[in-house]
């Protein structure tokens, strides 16, 4: 018999989800608790899809690149311009209030935030690289 899970609402800014390849959705502590994990743990979790939400009122402090899979960034509220370094040049995607941006794997990207924003992200983070903005 399969184990039963308790179904309850989760705040994706506090509790992230790991979508495992076996179909499981595993809740995991989010926010600073997640990002302060040892690098080896983060890399292990990066083999799954990470579903998270965060709020920001300033530009992202760094560029990032995800080599394994595309990243989905859904702006829930606010205003931001997403910068993608594509082979053909810099692409700017301006989003106000609501919109989904698909960042292709292997593309360096960052965000310039024009108004306090909430973003919902789905990322496979294994091998993610960062550099200063």
For every predicted segment, state its role.
Residues 79-81, 99, 118:
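Structural motif
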């Amino acid at each position: 018999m399969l184990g039963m899970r308790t179904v309850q609402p989760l705040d994706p800014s506090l509790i992230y989800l790991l979508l495992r390849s076996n179909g499981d959705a595993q809740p995991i502590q989010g926010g600073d608790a997640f990002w302060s994990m040892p690098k080896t743990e983060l890399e292990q979790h990066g083999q799954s899809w990470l579903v998270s939400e965060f709020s920001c009122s300033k530009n992202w402090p760094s560029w990032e690149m995800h080599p394994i899979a595309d990243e989905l960034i859904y702006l829930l509220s606010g205003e931001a311009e997403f910068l993608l370094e594509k082979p053909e040049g810099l692409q700017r995607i301006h989003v106000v209030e609501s919109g989904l941006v698909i960042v292709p794997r292997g593309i360096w990207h960052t965000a310039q935030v024009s108004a306090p924003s909430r973003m919902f992200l789905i990322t496979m983070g294994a091998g993610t690289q960062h550099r200063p903005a």
